[in-house]
Structures are given as C-alpha cells and as structure tokens.
C-alpha cells in the first residue's frame, strides 16, 4: 500500500501543472486591482471605438444625402446664318439695251450722287466732255476740314508751366481733291537759369540772394554772351557781384535798423508801464 500511495503521489505531481485547478496561489491585492482597472479600460476603449465607428458611418450617410444633384445642361441649338451672296456689278450696254439704273432707297443723297447716276445713264457714244459732269468739292469734306482746323486752334492743354506756342496743324483741300496738312516747327522753351549768391554778415550769419533769368525772351542776349570776350564777360560778372554786395549791405543795415527800432520801442513800453504803476500808487 505504501508503494502504491507513493507511486500515485509522484504520478500526480509529475502530470499536474501548477496552473491547474489543483494548484492555487493567493494573488496580491494590488495586482488584482490593476487587472480590474486594465479590464475596465479595455472595455471602455472598445466602447468608444464602437461609438466612433457608428458616428463616422452616420456622418458619411448624411454627407451622401446632402450632395446636390447635377442640373441638366441646357441644349444649345446653333442655327447657321445665311451667307450673303455678292451681287455682280452691272455691265454697261449700248444705249439701245442699256437698263436705266434706279437709285436705292432715297437717303441723304447729295448733288454729286445725282450727277453720278446721270452720267451712268447717258449714252456711251457721247463725247468725253459730256460724260464728265462739273465736279465740285464735297461740302461734307469741307465741313470736316473746317471743324478740324477750328478744333486745332481752340484746343489748349491744361498745364501749370508757362504758356508757350503749340504747333497747330492746318489742313486744306487741293483742287485735285487731295488733302494736305502742314505743321509749323516750334522751338521748345529753355529752362530758366537760377543763380544763388551767399555773403557772410559781420555778425556771423549768411545772407543769400537768388536770381532767376529766363533766356528764352532774350535769345539775342544769350547770343551776345557767346560773342563777348573773356575780359568783357569778367567785367560784367564783377559788376553784377558789386551790385549784389550793395544789396546785401542794404539788407544788413535794414536788419540793424530794425533791431535798434525794436529796442527803443521796448524801452518806451517799459517806461510807460513804470509810469502807469506810479500813477496807480
């Protein structure tokens, strides 16, 4: 019996693993708590994943239902336009069979057009002198030329620069019917010459004088300057400098006089104030 019991015990230990129901081990409470939390998180995660999938499916269905339907494209019918057929020009026949040309709908037809129809309907055997009517310049062309010349004279471009003569185009009609236009040449204005001379004052300041000269009105004076010798030119410059110096001295004197007048006026005002104070006391 002892041998049988030992054999049965050894067989049970060798064939039964520790993970079987015969082997039990007490788990740590923290381990059990962690396992419970992990199981809860997994179930919660699967729940939210399922909710997300359902929401995405609903959104896709709503988007598909909201897609606008493509409207039917209108049918465009293109009707070809009839091509106008050119009418051949009539051929002049002898007077016996020549058809009488009738003018079209009466519009503003001038006397020249009536002369032209009369000439076409005349006999081809007539002399050349009778075929050519007396041609006069058209009133319409004359009116256009007159209006053009009038507009050329009346047009003045707005500008803030000094007035200058602009080239005016004049058109005339020749005896042969041609129109010729002429434009005179206008010399552009030269820019004005500006010179500034600064002179030091005895008090340490500087007085500057600016002079401006426009060479266009006196083109002859510019030519005279070009023809002057160097000696005459230097003497003229010295004369101008002396004149400018005299004007500068006058300006300085006027400044001194103004200062003296101001000082005396202030003294008079102070004396009046003191006298008024004494009168009040």
Swiss-Prot record:
Major localization listed first in the record, in broad terms: virion
Protein's cellular compartments: Virion; Host endoplasmic reticulum-Golgi intermediate compartment membrane
Biased composition (Basic and acidic residues): 24-33
PTM text: Its phosphorylation state is regulated by the OPG054 kinase and the OPG106 phosphatase.
Annotated InterPro entries: Poxvirus_A4L
Biased composition (Low complexity): 155-175
Coiled-coil portions: none
Assembly description: Interacts with OPG136 and its cleaved form.
Stated family: Belongs to the orthopoxvirus OPG130 family.
Protein name, UniProt field: 39kDa core protein OPG130
Gene from which this protein is expressed: OPG130
């Amino acid at each position: 019996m002892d041998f049988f019991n030992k054999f049965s015990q050894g067989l049970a230990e060798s064939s039964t693993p520790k993970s079987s129901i015969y082997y039990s081990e007490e788990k740590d409470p923290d381990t059990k708590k962690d396992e419970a939390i992990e199981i809860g998180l997994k179930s919660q995660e699967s729940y939210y994943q399922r909710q997300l999938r359902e929401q995405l499916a609903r959104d896709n269905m709503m988007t598909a239902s909201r897609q606008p339907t493509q409207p039917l494209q209108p049918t465009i019918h293109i009707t070809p336009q009839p091509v106008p057929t050119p009418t051949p020009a009539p051929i002049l026949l002898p007077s016996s069979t020549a058809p009488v040309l009738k003018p079209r709908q009466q519009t503003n037809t001038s006397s020249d057009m009536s002369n032209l129809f009369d000439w076409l309907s005349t006999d081809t055997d007539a002399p050349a002198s009778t075929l050519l009517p007396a041609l006069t310049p058209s009133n319409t062309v004359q009116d256009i030329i007159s209006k053009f010349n009038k507009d050329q004279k009346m047009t003045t471009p707005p500008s803030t620069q000094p007035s200058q003569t602009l080239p005016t185009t004049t058109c005339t009609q020749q005896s042969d019917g041609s129109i010729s236009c002429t434009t005179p040449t206008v010399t552009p204005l030269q820019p004005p010459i500006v010179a500034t001379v600064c002179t030091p004052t005895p008090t340490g300041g500087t007085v500057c004088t600016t002079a401006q000269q426009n060479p266009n009105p006196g083109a002859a004076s510019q030519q005279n300057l070009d023809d002057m010798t160097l000696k005459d030119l230097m003497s003229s410059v010295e004369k101008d400098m002396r004149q400018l110096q005299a004007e500068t001295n006058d300006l300085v004197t006027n400044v001194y006089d103004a200062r003296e007048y101001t000082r005396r006026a202030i003294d008079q005002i102070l004396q009046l104030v003191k006298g008024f104070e004494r009168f009040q006391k």
